[in-house]
């Protein structure tokens, strides 16, 4: 499938230069992934002279030559996304997910090598020195994708020992802390915040991985704390120290009370405090962070579940009774067992703030309910039974964007529970959610789309959501959103279009053109979703006509030729619906090589794809030489 030109020749080269420049800034080592990342960054950086010379000498490129550079743009954009994710994320999560991460780096190497293969650098007028450098780099990329490094066996062994041994050897913990570059309390604090962010952004159920990360982080905190308190400890002194009363790690103490935290919360500056201590500080009228003295942007308090879990693990391993706090929803998973005691009194106090609080209090309470509802099933039931849903629905109309965002996301998390879906709809939420989808912040729009998808699982809700104007708003998000937003919109649209009436709404709303554009953008990551929606729309007469008028047949044939098994099946099904009873479209399909692609599909496709391909081939053969008569 061909790539569409994203911009002019000069703009394209400038983008490539800018991408390489940004990528070159990621060259510093990042623990166990450092060498793999460093090698890829170094090779990409060496491409810069090639792109810069093409700008300087203003070489005119032919259309077929530009294709390779556009493929390179897509590859470098994907590489940038990977580098940002790796360098800003949790090191422990990357350690546990290292095989997948290494595979992603390998995929990037393969993608860049494929792009270089499409660039005819031997025929482009650049200096001999630059041409030879590109040729050498191309060879290096080819060799790199064929000779990929295996996993670090020492690292795997150390991780297994640290996870499965009750009292890990300090030598192993030292190796791990050095490998992960978590050798100081400050670095461990940053890692704790990174795990916290990972937990908040994770779409699925993170508990198992979260528990493993928390347990290992706790061991590293113990080790680094012991190391820093005794710069040169002998083996004997370490053994003795383990029989003394455990020293509470500084990071577990509240900066205000200096006591072990029971209910750690994060303020807007990023500092963590014991809830009761910081609440007293705020109630006294203070507007600054006690530790940093920075002005607080708001009075909201976000539970630090990562730190709370670490404190629980530390108390358990040191034989200390776990501190109990009053008035909070507690969900703690220790040693593989999960306990959840959602404190109704605490939830009711949050609902009081939703109903009668200031804007800041409403924002903070909605944010806390959002997190609690995400945590587990029991919390979702507790929050709904306490009467939160109507109050959250009311706040969907809040003029404060952050409150609106928290409210729609809290409803999304509550809707995961099947029993809550009906309560959300009964509270009149659909119209307000659609309004957020139209006019909210980008994150609020994305979560509104996800909420509508969740609610649309119930068939009668599909009708109500479509009637409320959601389809047009979802199409806008499909065109304007981030990659995640596009996927949320596409998933919701697909589910809604199972209802026949919503197919017409989607077609009249102009969905076919953006879907066709997504089909043509191989690097956009939305081909699967676009095909799935088109497949369901092609069973509708209006949809069939609109898809054909969008000149989609050549694109569909290309997907049948080169796509994944599932995409080839969907493309064949769409083409079958378009061509049945329409000789003109059959002729177009034949002209772009459909017969060859379909013949191959009858041999190597899925069962459904084989049936559609065989039927289409028969139609094409029957209509050869027949005069064109159009049937809509």
Curated annotation (Swiss-Prot):
GO BP terms in the entry: protein ubiquitination
SUPFAM superfamilies according to UniProt: ARM repeat, RING/U-box
Tissue localization of expression: Expressed in flowers, green siliques, seeds and rosette leaves.
Repeat positions for ARM: 377-416, 418-457, 459-498, 500-539, 541-580
GO terms for MF: transmembrane receptor protein serine/threonine kinase binding; ubiquitin-protein transferase activity
One matching Pfam family: U-box
Site (Putative E2 binding site): 256, 281, 290
InterPro entries noted in UniProt: ARM-like, ARM-type_fold, Armadillo, RING-Ubox_PUB, Ubox_domain, Znf_RING/FYVE/PHD
Recorded superkingdom: Eukaryota
Domain spans labelled U-box: 247-321
Catalytic activity: S-ubiquitinyl-[E2 ubiquitin-conjugating enzyme]-L-cysteine + [acceptor protein]-L-lysine = [E2 ubiquitin-conjugating enzyme]-L-cysteine + N(6)-ubiquitinyl-[acceptor protein]-L-lysine
Record keywords: Repeat, Transferase, Ubl conjugation pathway
EC number, as in UniProt: 2.3.2.27
Pathway annotation from the record: Protein modification; protein ubiquitination
Domain notes: The U-box N-terminal domain (UND) is not required for in vitro ubiquitination activity.
Function: Functions as an E3 ubiquitin ligase with specific E2 ubiquitin-conjugating enzymes. Undergoes auto-ubiquitination.
Subunit structure: Homodimer. Interacts with SNL1. Binds to SD11, SD16, SD17, SD18, SD113, SD129 and SD25.
Protein name as it appears in the record: U-box domain-containing protein 14
